[in-house]
Amino acid sequence: MREKHYSEDNSRKRKRGELEHNSDLNETVLPSDWTPDPVKNFAADDDDEETKAKDATMVLPFVKKSPVWKIYESMEVFKRVPQSPHFSPLFEAKEDFREGFALGMMVTFSGVLEKVEDLKTDVPIRQLNSLKDSFTELEKHGFTVTAPLSRIAKLLALKDRQLKILEELKVFDKEMKDESSKKHKAEQEFGEMERKILEVKNKVLELQKQEAALEKQKDATYEKICKMESRARDLGVELEDVE
């Protein structure tokens, strides 16, 4: 019975020690003057209770120590587009680098968002894909990127349509050139044919003239023969009279 009591007493001491140890760990990881969410000021005043509860329980992979956070939190872009990134992928990074990486991503988000807002329809596809990759990476760290990705997707779709139209125009232009070449060739052949027809017409006209001349010559010869025959008959009559 004494051994059982001793064992239970030791068990209670171990549990109490574990709780105290865990309490010390919690104080080390989450000091009393540290807010779990390093970007809590990014949330809009009208955030719903669910978002507030989520932010309150968020545990980041680093302690917000840099005074630069206040500068970033007061930037217009984060007031206009509130953000609550969790930076959970940074748990895989070296601890000393985590906060710096997070600050870098804050700057990156501000920069790429500004670029997206200033995009024109003539933006190169390469730039759109680069921005898309940047926002996709930021999304992994908890940034809300639905709006910029949607704009990029629309511009990419527009670019895709433009490329298709350009391809269609290229095909159409080639077909137009082919048809124009055929038309030019047909015009040349038609011109050659007209020239030959004109030559034939001129030849026919010449032959018709020759025919008319021969017809006239034939008639003149016939008339002459008739006159000669008539004269021969007259001479025959005169000869008979003389006899």
From Swiss-Prot:
UniProt subcellular location: Nucleus
Free-text disruption phenotype from the record: No visible phenotype under normal growth conditions.
Keywords recorded for this protein, A-Z: Coiled coil, Growth regulation, Nucleus, Transport
Ranges annotated as biased composition (Basic and acidic residues): 1-24
Domain of life: Eukaryota
Expression (tissue specificity): Expressed in leaves, flowers and siliques.
Function noted in UniProt: May be involved in the polar growth of plant cells via transportation of RNAs.
Quaternary structure (record): Homodimer.
Protein name as catalogued: DUF724 domain-containing protein 5
Originating organism: Arabidopsis thaliana (Mouse-ear cress)
Gene of this entry: DUF5
